[in-house]
Amino acid sequence: MSEPTRMQMLAQVLEQNPSDAFARYGLAMEHARMGQNDSALNEFSKLLQMHPDYTNGYFMAAQTLVKVDRNEEAKKMLENGIAAAKRTGNRHALSEMSGMLDELS
């Protein structure tokens, strides 16, 4: 029997605990890595609905949106992420997302 893939392992974790932010983010990133952008965006959406202060989710969702030429949605995602970064005091995320928003504007 073959070893389970990262995606399969993350899906198993989420079956047991659907609100696991780390596993949800990891699954979204695996989809993005494989070019499955719609699936990635779906997972990022679930993540951010359950964990609105998970700042990396906003940044990576925005990058995925840019990949599929949805720049206006990416800007809105970054604005929401910047608000989350301010709420949580995450200066690094604030800087990254502000820089990306400036590039898109």
Question: Where are the model-predicted features located?
Answer:
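Canonical positions in the second alpha-helix
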Residues: 12-13, 46-47, 81
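Structural marker of alpha-solenoid helical repeat scaffolds
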Residues: 16, 50, 84-88
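Residue at a conserved register position within TPR or TPR-like alpha-solenoid repeats
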Residues: 31, 65, 98-101, 105
